[in-house]
Amino acid sequence: MKTFILSIVCILTTIPLIAQEPLFNGIDLDGWNIHGTELWYVDHGLLVCESGPDKGYGYLSTSKYYDDFDLTLEFKQESNGNSGVFIRSTVEGTKVSGWQVEVAPPGSDTGGVYESYGRGWLIKPEKEKDKALKMGEWNTMRIRVVGDQIESWLNDTPMIKFVDEKIGQGKGSIALQIHDGGGIKVRWRNLLVTPL
């Protein structure tokens, strides 16, 4: 028995531990860049995005680039709640180049992958998976990007698994989006990334 336990300890000590990094400190927007006039602020430890005076697109991008990673976060949509999580993205003004994992109202393909200013929808979840979304409640999203493969989960439900050469060549930050049109408010918390 002692030999078995010692063997397990030896194995565990040789496996490199990959640290999870918080993207949001719960205090301020340190480590993030705001793009556009939409509102991004901290309220009682939560990250909030809200339509601003121009009712346009807005983005909040990490200062750091992430290539291969596993990201988990929680979001709560209020009103329309159309938003998204961009991966390997760059933002110039309010024009983003990259891929969005959709965060949207029921029936609008949350968890699907959309390429902005490019090919449009690359993959949408099967319609029956829409029931995983809890509108007006806290939802947990997980996004895993390795090489040319992207996967998403919503509240532990696998939403998509997709391979795309162009995504595999992408470089950039993780960014949150608020859609244009006005009247949108989304709260975010527990944004944790594990670089792979």
PLM region descriptions:
Residues 15-19:
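Sec/Tat signal peptide C-region and signal peptidase I cleavage site
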